[in-house]
A protein has these predicted regions:
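Glycine/proline-enriched, intrinsically flexible loops and inter-domain linkers
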Residues: 1-438, 442-447, 461-472
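Cysteine-nucleophile active-site neighborhood
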Residues: 446-488
């Protein structure tokens, strides 16, 4: 392994300078403000995380929605009944590590994606991977072929080590523009299945809880000792299921400080770091390592579980959750709001999270009704018609919501493969509207939001004379209701 080992050094220059000057506060603030650590909430919120009822947790957690999650978890969509089976997905990749060593970059991409599933409560043994590869353009220079070879060798090493396959993927070797090359890229996506009740989220839950740090072993070539990693992750998974671990975070190319801060932001709880935690642990890469929040009465259970697995040397106390809303590390006391300003400030002007600085309260008098209007056409169970167009995606959720409330639903797909299909669909839709008391337009991307904007397909179809007449009769003659969500 070369002397300038990326895995053993503090990679952010400003952080390294602050550590060299023994300025812990400056080091924490520089780490949180770093482009690879800072908040991307403004960018994330451009993509709607609230559509659909299947999501188990939001992209940001905690009372203040500031702890970023490391994976996505969603229930399987079923037409009837309840489902507690969830799918999980997480990714891993560090371009700086891959640039230093494509071989290690691929190994730790696989490990990082796997560890993020584990910290959310997933069982790593059920994981399957898919790899996205992107390399510089290959030419007659044989040295250029070394990068994809080394990266794929690393990914293969990790698959054999964990006994888990990659069952799909995509590659491109066109990442060159003039004399600019992309870093050797192998992004690992880990996909898993689990039960909803086993899922945990990464934000800190309560003051007084202890923070334990689990570490992986590496061999002399800085490759993970897979047998030890699997034993450790088995133990962590079992402890999560028993409720001994209530939140956890998988470390990446940054150290423990960034992980603890991100866990703390969601509920604005502080952290007191133990004095024996080194600056390397706080700021150097920690791929595969996990920090976990453990209720005070459960720490003995955790230590015992690790001891029984022969892993006593791989767990130590890193600190505790405090009530002071501050990060305390030796002589340093950093207020959580100051840390938050550093973390959110880097990209706030690029991807703003606040629409305006105007704090004027907006009055919403929309729902203030002096009298309740009662429908003149009474039915025991109202029927709701839900029209489905190619691209809509919340008809299941909408139908379930109405059925839970006591309504009957008619869900029909608008078929548009040929003219005959369209004519049949118009007749079916008209018949369904005539039977309904409510029409509910679901959300999604009808016709991919083409041409030029959302719901054009909806609007075009419902301009058909038969359907227009049926809707007008529903609203004006039968005292019916129409509503929609998103595209609808």
């Amino acid at each position: 392994v070369p002397e300038d080992n990326y895995l053993n050094k503090i990679s952010t220059p400003k952080v390294a300078d602050a550590v060299a000057k023994n300025d812990m506060k400056a080091a924490w603030l520089a780490e949180l403000a770093d482009l690879n650590v800072c908040s991307q909430k403004g960018l994330v919120e451009m993509f709607d995380g609230s559509i659909g009822a299947g999501s188990v947790y939001m992209p940001f957690g905690g009372k203040y929605q500031l702890t970023e999650t490391q994976s996505m978890v969603a229930k399987l969509p079923v037409a009837h009944g309840k489902c507690d089976t969830v799918t999980m997905m997480a990714y891993g990749f560090d371009p700086y590590l891959a640039s230093w060593s494509p071989y290690h970059g691929a190994i730790y991409a696989v490990l990082e994606s796997l560890s993020r599933i584990v910290t959310a409560g997933g069982d790593y043994k059920k994981i399957r991977f898919t790899f996205q590869e992107y390399f510089r353009r290959m030419n007659e220079d044989p040295k250029r072929w070394s990068q994809p070879f080394a990266a794929l060798l690393g990914a293969y090493n990790a698959q054999i080590g964990f006994g888990l396959p990659s069952i799909g993927g995509k590659d491109s070797m066109s990442g060159t523009f003039n004399d600019i090359d992309v870093p050797p890229t192998l992004v690992s996506f880990a996909v898993d299945v689990a039960k909803e009740q086993d899922i945990i989220t990464p934000e800190l839950k309560a003051a007084g809880n202890e923070l334990l740090y689990f570490t992986i072993d590496k061999d002399e070539y800085d490759v993970p000792v897979y047998a030890q990693v699997m034993k450790l992750y088995d133990a962590v998974h079992a402890l999560i299921q028993k409720g001994a671990i209530v939140s956890a975070y998988a470390l990446d190319g940054k150290g423990l400080a960034a992980a603890l801060a991100k866990m703390a932001f969601g509920n604005k709880l502080g952290v007191t770091v133990d004095t024996d935690v080194t600056t390397d642990t706080l700021f150097a890469p920690g791929f595969g390592n996990i920090v976990a929040e453990v209720p005070a009465g459960k720490t003995a259970e955790v230590y015992e579980a690790l001891h029984n697995a022969g892993l006593s040397a791989n767990v130590k106390r890193a600190g505790a959750v405090n009530e002071e809303a501050a990060f305390i590390c030796g002589d340093m006391k950093l207020a959580i709001d100051e840390a938050l300003n550093a973390w959110t400030g880097t990209l706030e002007k690029v991807f703003p999270t606040r629409a305006t600085e105007d704090k004027e309260e907006v009055k919403t008098d929309l729902y203030h009704a002096d009298s309740v209007y009662v429908c003149k056409h009474k039915v025991a169970r109202p029927t709701v018609f839900i029209p489905v167009f190619p691209g809509t995606n919340c008809e299941y959720d909408s139908a379930k919501a109405f059925e839970r409330a006591g309504a009957d639903t008619i869900v029909k797909v608008f078929k548009n493969l040929n003219a005959e299909d369209i004519r049949e669909s118009v007749d079916e839709f008209t018949k369904a509207i005539d039977q309904a008391q409510i029409i509910m337009f679901p959300g999604g991307f009808s016709a991919g939001d083409e041409p030029e904007g959302s719901a054009k397909f909806f609007a075009t179809a419902f301009r058909n004379a038969k359907m227009t007449e049926a809707v007008m009769k529903l609203l004006n003659e039968r005292d019916g209701l129409a509503l929609g969500i998103c595209n609808g």
